[in-house]
Amino acid sequence: MDPLASSISQFALEFSKELAASAAGKNIFFSPWSISSALAMVYLGARGTTAVEMAKVLQLNRDQADKTGPESEKKRKMEFNLGKAEEIHCDFQTLISEILKPTDAHVLKTANGIYGEKTYPFHNKYLEEVKTYFGAEPQSVNFVEASDQIRKEINSWVESQTQGKILNLLPDDSVDSTTRMILVNALYFKGTWEHQFLAQNTTEKPFRINETTSKPVQMMSMKEKLHVFHIEKPQATGLQLYYERRDVSLFILLPEDLGGLEQLEKAITYEKLNEWTSADMMELYDVQLSLPKFKLEESYDLKSTLSSMGMSDAFNPSKADFSGMSLERNLYLSNIFHKVFVEINEEGTEAAAGTGSEVGFRIKYPSIEFNVDHPFLFFIRHNKTNSILFYGRFCSP
């Protein structure tokens, strides 16, 4: 796996565990790729301990750590070679270009923006590099005198960048005259399935939240040859659903037990996820699939989560070092706002004649029923780059 894609996958799992610790019984949904690339724009201007902390949280040292000896030695020897920063940003440039390559198979719209108080002007070199590597243009704005007007303008920009799907990213009172710099990050995805669900097969079914509580959902169903993988500890079954052209896939990790989600979340690691979803682990089955139809829209103020993961200096007025971004020494990151939207519904490919048909003898595959009627983990992966675009858990309709 590409070192940057592996860093993003590791960040996804660590970030998810941090969110889960304070969100028992709640849905979680975020974009590790989008958060990572947005933070990398800030990392580009970070120096000193601020940069070291960001590299650790973003797992940008991961390829170095993997090459050292035993676990204790890894930790002891782990060094964050900030001289590699240019290579890291070139990797982000390549990855972003590949993921956002125009296609008629799916819609992926992202909005990344850095807004700094105008009395802390950005270096020209920083502005040039952010545009080169990330295709973004940091904005100098008047938070001191017009914070609410700036908030509304940012919201309008995000709305236009995401085809009207991400609204009101910055809520009332989220910025004020003391705001120095904020990072906004929004992502919208809509894909069509390789094998579509038929709307007439969607029926109301119970989704079991726990042993005593159920809620009705619109349950989609199909019978199709799909890739399935089995997880032994804790016991769970996984399934891969391709979107059109197979550029992107949805993976579902369904615990065998109704109450098994917590154990699965605790057990999952970067290495295990790689193993479970490898081609060697996948087997084709004739699957009778039942999957809830759902929309998820989640908003996060990332300051507290990232601080608790170890990235605290960036938010500290007396410790932040963004001297690669501005000459003003007391520039710091006031907040990071992240919002994502996804819709899982019946829509599949607008099938051309012959789609889904087979020539020659039909191979008989083992049959399995995959009934997603209780809490599960899921993620959406860009297959060519092996990057996790979205990661989430669905606990309650």
Curated annotation (Swiss-Prot):
Its main location: nucleus. The lineage of its organism: Eukaryota, Metazoa, Chordata, Craniata, Vertebrata. InterPro entries: Serpin_CS (IPR023795), Serpin_dom (IPR023796), Serpin_fam (IPR000215), Serpin_sf (IPR036186), Serpin_sf_1 (IPR042178), Serpin_sf_2 (IPR042185). PANTHER family: SERINE PROTEASE INHIBITOR, SERPIN, SERPIN B10. It is found in: Nucleus; Cytoplasm. One of its GO terms (cellular component) is nucleus. The gene is SERPINB10. The record marks R362, I363 as: Reactive bond. It comes from the Eukaryota. This is Serpin B10. Pfam families: Serpin. Protease inhibitor that may play a role in the regulation of protease activities during hematopoiesis and apoptosis induced by TNF. May regulate protease activities in the cytoplasm and in the nucleus.
